[in-house]
Amino acid sequence: GITNMQEIKDDYYDGERPLYGIHDTKLINTTFGKGESPLKETANLALDGVLFTWKYPLWYSDQITVTDTIFEEMSRSGIWYTNDIEITNSTIQAPKEFRRCDGITLDNVHFSDAEETMWSCKNIKMHDVYANGDYLGMNSENIYVDHLDLVGNYVFDGAKNVEVHNSRLVSKDAFWNCENVTIYDSKISGEYLAWNTKNITFINCTIESDQGLCYVDHLTMKNCRTLRTDLAFELCSNIDAEIKGSIMSIKNPISGQIKVDHVDEIIMDDPKIDQSKIKIIQNDQG
């Protein structure tokens, strides 16, 4: 809670570990200059208008709220082994933020370099997040996303239990090696979507993916569009897909049903596949 919190205001710190281990403290309009690990091993902090300019600002910390704060480019690897952190209305210029954290809530946060960000974390909520960079969210789990605008490849590689709403992802190799993903009302553009993933569902989505949706087990699509998508569904099993409009080509799916308005080309040339287990229904063919 916020009761009995001491306050640090309009201050400046540099050097190594200047506020090591502080707790139950509000930091307002405070800048951390050159010096590693300024807030290591801290707990129950409320940061407002803080500027971090150097490495490892929040390691091994618990119960941190952050508002209107800037993590500059050199505040890299900034938030590791930290639990229950909430960041609102803030800008993160540094890569490699968040590693092995439990309990991350982001609201109106801009990552200008999201490379290797949020790896091996769990219990994540993101709302109104703008991110640019490769490998966001790798091997993380229990993720709820609403309005993520991402430009960056390999998003959520190896993630588990992911729910995405109202998002726009420009990402090749998105959702590889995942388990239990549901995506609603979103646009995804980028080749090789969701390979090697188990249990992925797309509802009201627009997908543009060269060789997308291959090697998936349990793929569900409801009211989706596949713009410029070819060689889809290769070696995909347990498909339940309902696609509006057309798809360029479908290649060697293993099992399930695909309903689509029109397919330009169906390629079934893999002798290992029992074609009686797959049904492709084209609405324009009655």
Residue ranges and their predicted role:
Residues I2-G286:
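Long, distal/terminal scaffolding or interaction modules
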